[in-house]
Structures are given as C-alpha cells and as structure tokens.
C-alpha cells in the first residue's frame, strides 16, 4: 500500500442482484479513491459480467491480501473467491447459489476486518429468499454480522447530509412500537446511542429524543407516553451526565438536527426516522451498524431484481456508503 487512506472492504452482495453493478460503477468515481483504498470481495466472473452490463471497462487486480492492492482509479482490487458458476447464475432471480455466495463474501470481509486488513466494510444488497435457498439461516446482513462478530444486539444509525438518526424500535407493528416506549428502554437507548456516537468520534453537541404523539403529547392531552416514559428517561440520563434533551415534536426535531442544533435524533419507531431521512435524500441515506468490533456502512436498498442486469441501477448510495465508511474509520474505536 502506498498511502495511509483507510482500506474499505466491499462484499459485492447477491451476484444475481444489482450489487455487482453498483460496485463497479462506484469504482469509476474519483471521489472513492480520494477518500479510501477500496477492495472488492467477490467473484471475478461476476464483476466482469457486471462491467458488461454497465458498459464499464476497468482492470481487475486479483489479490490475496490487502497490502497487494494497487488502489488506483481504473483498477479494481479484488479478493476473488471464485464461487460462482456464471453459466448457472440467473440474473434477477432468487437462487441458492447466489445466496450462498453472498454469505461467503460477507464472511470473508468480516474475517479480513477482524484480522486488521480492513478498516471498515461497506455492504451491498443481499436477498433473504436467496439466503434461505442457499441454506444460509439468517434473515439479513445485520444478523449475519452480529453472529460473525459475537455481537448480541447491534444498533442501527442512519446518516444523511450530516443528520444522524437512531431507532428505539424497528421491525415491529406501530401498535407494538408504542408499547415498547418505556422509561427503561428509552434510557437504555440514550446510553447506547451516546456510546455509539463516541465510538464514531462524535463528541460535540447533544442528542434529541423525538416525541411519540402529536406535539409530544401536549402534557398528556394527546397521549401520556412522553410524561410516563420519555421525560423520566431523559431526566435520568441527564443526571448521569449524558447530553440529551426532549421530547421534541417529531414535526420539527429532524429539521432542527439538520440545522445543527442536535448531533443526532433518537426516533421512537421505524417510519418516524425512515420518512425523515429518506424524504431528505433517499439515495444518500446510509445505514451505519454500531456496537460491533468492526465498522460497517450499507446502502439502504435491496437487490432490485427487476432491473438487475440492465445497468440502470444508481451507484449514488454505494458511493455514499463507501465514503461514509472512510469518514468514520479513522476515528472508530473497537
């Protein structure tokens, strides 16, 4: 390696989806090489096929170790696992060989990160059904990464245009999400989110907790979750020394965070935070997985089987995920 830029590992995702295409397109962008040293973990045959789909012509430098990389615009440094029979791969279809290969790309990336060869990983889309067809018994990236890194409960943060958003609840019904707004849970997440920010090197500013009800309940007029759970949790966290305030009405808290008043927002349910970030900039909303011994960023879209193989998939999110990994990796504390 001829520079001190962070080395970012990029597993290419489900080879039947758009992952290989968005990765190939991303590595035509000078910004990526200005910020980091990217290494793909995948299959050379799949990458060559993706270049054909995208009308991109890049050299492939197959390597065994990160320090063999050239890290030069115009050349892809690739850890070639050679685990796909390209004649059997059906682009845009659920299939076991693709799910199994996608898992192996992730596993190799994690191994390299744990050994110190990679400073972070930026992941591409995988497909739950393909994983199942390939006898990979996980429902997604986060669960795979948690198991491979012995992490009990990873914490997801979204970042877009400098605004950071955490989630008190995610994949539960709205009715269930309301039941999960308890003092104990809110306090626990304030602490965990604060620790996550510190690991990323974010030390200035304070966190805001979003309200659940209209106008944060208006002193119990529109619901009492704020009075019973959110306010007591915030007050206790403040006594413990955490920089946090709220509840702030969800109709204004994200605007205030975007303007710089808060370094992050703890949203109380899935769509509250997703709508705010993705309306601001859908393609540049990037997921950062916290709480693991390795740093991971990810695009927040799927395999897009309907357009796989057409070269139409946008690489904006992938570039953003790589650049964000490069931004945080020098500050990341294991």
From Swiss-Prot:
> Which positions in this protein are listed as binding substrate?
141-142, 278, 296
For this chain, one GO molecular function annotation is: NAD binding
Task: Please name the InterPro entries in this protein's record.
Answer: PdxA_fam
The reaction(s) this protein catalyses: 4-O-phospho-D-threonate + NAD(+) = dihydroxyacetone phosphate + CO2 + NADH
Which UniProt keywords are listed? Carbohydrate metabolism, Metal-binding, NAD, Oxidoreductase
For this chain's record, the cofactor binding note is:
Binds 1 divalent metal cation per subunit.
* Pfam families recorded: PdxA
At which positions is a divalent metal cation bound?
171, 215, 270
Q: What EC number(s) are associated with this protein in UniProt?
A: 1.1.1.408
The UniProt record lists the keyword Metal-binding:
yes
Q: How does it assemble?
A: Homodimer.
Reported function: Catalyzes the NAD-dependent oxidation and subsequent decarboxylation of D-threonate 4-phosphate to produce dihydroxyacetone phosphate (DHAP).
Q: Which PANTHER family match?
A: 4-HYDROXYTHREONINE-4-PHOSPHATE DEHYDROGENASE, D-THREONATE 4-PHOSPHATE DEHYDROGENASE
The protein's name: Putative D-threonate 4-phosphate dehydrogenase
Organism expressing this protein natively: Clostridium botulinum (strain Langeland / NCTC 10281 / Type F)
- Gene name as annotated: pdxA
């Amino acid at each position: 390696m001829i520079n001190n830029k962070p080395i970012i590992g990029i597993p290419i995702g489900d080879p039947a989806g758009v992952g290989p295409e968005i990765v190939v397109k991303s590595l035509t962008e000078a910004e990526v090489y200005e910020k980091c040293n990217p290494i793909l973990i995948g299959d050379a045959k799949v990458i060559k096929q993706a270049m054909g789909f995208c009308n991109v012509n890049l050299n492939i430098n197959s390597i065994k170790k990160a320090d063999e990389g050239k890290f030069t615009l115009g050349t892809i440094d690739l850890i070639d696992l050679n685990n796909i029979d390209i004649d059997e791969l059906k682009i845009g279809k659920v299939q076991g060989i693709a799910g199994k290969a996608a898992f192996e790309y992730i596993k190799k990336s994690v191994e390299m990160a744990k050994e110190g060869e990679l400073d972070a990983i930026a992941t591409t889309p995988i497909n739950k059904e393909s994983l199942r067809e390939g006898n990979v018994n996980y429902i997604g990236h986060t669960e795979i990464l948690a198991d491979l890194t012995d992490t009990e409960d990873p914490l997801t943060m979204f970042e877009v245009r400098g605004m950071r958003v955490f989630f008190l609840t995610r994949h539960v019904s709205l009715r269930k999400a309301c039941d999960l707004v308890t003092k104990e849970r809110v306090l626990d997440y304030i602490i965990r989110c604060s620790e996550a920010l510190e690991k990323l090197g974010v030390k200035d500013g304070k966190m805001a907790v979003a309200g659940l009800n209209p106008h944060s309940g208006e002193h119990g007029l529109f619901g009492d979750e704020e009075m019973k759970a959110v306010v007591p949790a915030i007050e206790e966290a403040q006594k413990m020394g955490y920089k946090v305030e709220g509840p702030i009405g969800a109709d204004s808290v994200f605007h205030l965070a975007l303007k710089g008043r808060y370094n992050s927002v703890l949203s109380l349910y899935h769509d509250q935070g997703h709508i705010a970030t993705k309306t601001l900039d859908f393609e540049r909303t990037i997921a950062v997985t916290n709480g693991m011994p390795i740093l991971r960023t990810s695009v927040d879209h799927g395999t897009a089987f309907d357009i796989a193989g057409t070269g139409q998939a946008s690489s904006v999110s992938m570039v953003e995920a790589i650049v964000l990994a490069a931004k945080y990796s020098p500050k990341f504390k294991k």
